[in-house]
Design a protein with these regions (language model features):
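Ankyrin-repeat boundary/"N-cap" motif
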Residues: 32-44, 65-81, 100-107, 128-138, ...
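Ankyrin-repeat and related helical/solenoid repeat scaffolds used for protein-protein interactions
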Residues: 162-205
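Leucine-rich solenoid repeat scaffolds
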Residues: 79-86, 91, 95, 194-221
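Ankyrin repeat A-helix N-terminal signature
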Residues: 44-49, 77, 81-87, 105-111, ...
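Ankyrin repeat domain, specifically the short helix-to-loop turn at the C-terminus of the second helix
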Residues: 57-63, 92-99, 119-125, 150-158, ...
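TPR-adjacent "capping" and linker segments in tetratricopeptide-repeat scaffold/adaptor proteins
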Residues: 25-33, 94-98
Length: 221
């Protein structure tokens, strides 16, 4: 999932951004050498295409923190794209190149100590959202770190439990799926951006134990 078209003029900007966190701020500067299409292409590549990210960044280092505007309020950088789809290789590469570590990316990477530190420093960070308004909990679910997910949920990051379930099922994290189903009240029949339910994904990926668990709790394909 790479964002949504809203029928408004798209914009490509470079910004200093801690966009996922509550204390977010923006410094936007238009860069004449970067076209809107180029920034959009780079951000889309950030959703898991490491080879393309490497190539584009080597040719245009200014793309690193380039942000594409899907709408007037929905900006996305390549590392935010990597964080929302759970692409560890892309996120780690962009961090190595100097991209800012946002709390959503830290959660996706399973950096529990870093996430906890940021929430201690600013409790409002528990309500952080990434690109497209995706909450913190689904990002953390990509990591498979049950303790991290439990910590976030206990401290108020309970939005996005259905998306978190989808991510856990996609990765085959059985223990995390069990915990989410029993504690986080996800919609077991919610559909992802491909129109698939968690049970459909489990069956498609031949995750029989997860599929059995979901059926026991009333999930449908």
């Amino acid at each position: 999932m790479t964002g949504r078209e809203h029928g408004i003029p798209a914009r490509a900007v470079l910004r200093t951004v801690i966009g996922c966190e509550r204390e977010s701020y923006r410094v936007q500067t238009t860069n004449a050498s970067l076209s809107t299409d180029m920034v959009r292409e780079f951000v889309i590549a950030g959703h898991g295409n490491l080879e393309k990210v490497r190539k584009m960044l080597e040719e245009n280092p200014e793309l690193l923190n380039g942000s594409y505007a899907w709408s007037e309020t929905d900006y996305e950088t390549a590392i935010q794209g990597a964080a929302q789809v759970g692409s560890v290789p892309v996120a780690e590469y962009l961090l190595e190149k100097g991209a800012p570590l946002e709390i959503c990316a830290a959660a996706m990477l399973g950096q529990k100590d870093e996430v906890e530190r940021r929430i201690r420093d600013n409790p409002d960070n528990i309500n952080s959202k990434g690109a497209h308004g995706i909450p913190l909990l689904p990002h953390a679910a990509w990591s498979g770190d049950l303790e991290l997910v439990q910590y976030l949920f206990r401290n108020g990051a309970n939005a996005g439990s259905s998306s978190a379930l989808h991510n856990a099922v996609t990765r085959g994290y059985y223990d995390l799926v069990v915990w989410l189903v029993e504690n986080a009240s996800p919609d077991l029949n919610s559909k992802n951006f491909q129109g698939k339910t968690p049970l459909s994904v489990a069956i498609e990926r031949k995750q029989e134990t997860i599929a059995h668990l979901l059926r026991e709790h009333g999930a449908n394909e």
